[in-house]
Amino acid sequence: MIEIMDTTLRDGEQTSGVSFAAHEKLSIAQVLLNDLGVNRVEIASARVSDGEFEAVKRVAAWAARSGNLDKLEVLGFVDGTVSLDWIESAGCRVVNLLCKGSYKHVTEQLRKAPEQHVDDIRTVVLEAAKRKIDVNIY
């Protein structure tokens, strides 16, 4: 089965120079999920700003009412529980966990041994499971 995951609403390099207001994110998410049949929508990166948090809360509230909550995803980081706390507080239930896949990234960017990064990932995934937050690893 092929699924479409849209990242338009996650402000950042994929939409360089573009930042959506909360009402715009809500309208776009509604069109993507209801009208275009997109399977999954990544709506934000965790911990970006207070404005982003409020936008995610607004979209998540609509998604919960309309049966689309499991289709909303938020990019999170291997940061203990910080991203999970943000995502859960915003009302979302799916984290796309950004993990490093190359030795160079782990050792030079994170300054960790690969085993430590794997342990850190495991810690986040286990905590997410306790909170009933689904995890996709990237």
Task: Give residue spans per PLM region.
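Active-site mouth loops of central-metabolism enzymes
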Residues: 4-26, 71-80, 106-116, 138
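Short, well-ordered coil/turn segments that N-cap beta-strands
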Residues: 1-2, 37-39, 65-72, 91-93, ...
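Conserved, mostly hydrophobic/aromatic
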Residues: 12, 32, 95, 137
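Non-cysteine beta-strand/loop elements that form the S-adenosyl-L-methionine
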Residues: 5-7, 92-103
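Glycine-rich, proline-tolerant flexible connector loops at the mouths of alpha/beta enzymes
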Residues: 37-63, 75, 99-112, 138
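Hydrophobic alpha-helical hairpins/lids featuring a short glycine-rich hinge
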Residues: 86, 96, 102-138
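Alpha-helix-loop-beta-strand connector modules within alpha/beta enzyme cores
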Residues: 49-78, 116-133
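Catalytic domains of carbohydrate-active enzymes, especially glycoside hydrolases
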Residues: 25-46, 86-94
